[in-house]
Amino acid sequence: MGVTKKPDLNDPVLRAKLAKGMGHNYYGEPAWPNDLLYIFPVVILGTIACNVGLAVLEPSMIGEPADPFATPLEILPEWYFFPVFQILRTVPNKLLGVLLMVSVPAGLLTVPFLENVNKFQNPFRRPVATTVFLIGTAAALWLGIGATLPIDKSLTLGLF
């Protein structure tokens, strides 16, 4: 942990600078009105102009039209729904699968209350939150990769 050096307010050079208004906030320019009125709108409008320009010049293709007579063998959701899809696919009771899905955000909501006595922001000094994050990330990756495989290899990822 570093040592913070406090200014010596009895130093005559520092007192002279503070008297002139040259304190810690002397360098730079203020955010109001320069940034908020002039720079931010230019950046926002420039970003919108780039997006509109790319959409006009290079429109993305929607894809081939749907054929109701050619249904794929296995319908997969979007990639960000793979872990949830895997839970619903592997749990035999659908009500239990829905309860498992609801328990994930409910469990995440309890983590701040478990560590409310710990005021550190460093993740290595917050073991409960770090453990929940690491286990949750590993489980989401495991379920997400398993959702892309056939049902008989989905839980073992074809490794065992």
Swiss-Prot record:
Superkingdom assignment: Eukaryota
GO cellular component: chloroplast; chloroplast thylakoid; chloroplast thylakoid membrane; plastid; thylakoid
Compartments reported by the entry: Plastid, Chloroplast thylakoid membrane
InterPro entries assigned to the protein according to its UniProt record, in alphabetical order: Cyt_b/b6_C (IPR005798), Cyt_b/b6_C_sf (IPR036150), Cyt_b6/f_cplx_suIV (IPR005870), Cytochrome_b_C_euk/bac (IPR048260)
Regions that span the bilayer: 36-56, 95-115, 131-151
Molecular function per GO: electron transporter, transferring electrons within cytochrome b6/f complex of photosystem II activity; electron transporter, transferring electrons within the cyclic electron transport pathway of photosynthesis activity; oxidoreductase activity
Family of the protein in this entry: Belongs to the cytochrome b family. PetD subfamily.
Subunit structure: The 4 large subunits of the cytochrome b6-f complex are cytochrome b6, subunit IV (17 kDa polypeptide, petD), cytochrome f and the Rieske protein, while the 4 small subunits are petG, petL, petM and petN. The complex functions as a dimer.
Protein's recorded name: Cytochrome b6-f complex subunit 4
Organism in which the protein naturally occurs: Arabidopsis thaliana
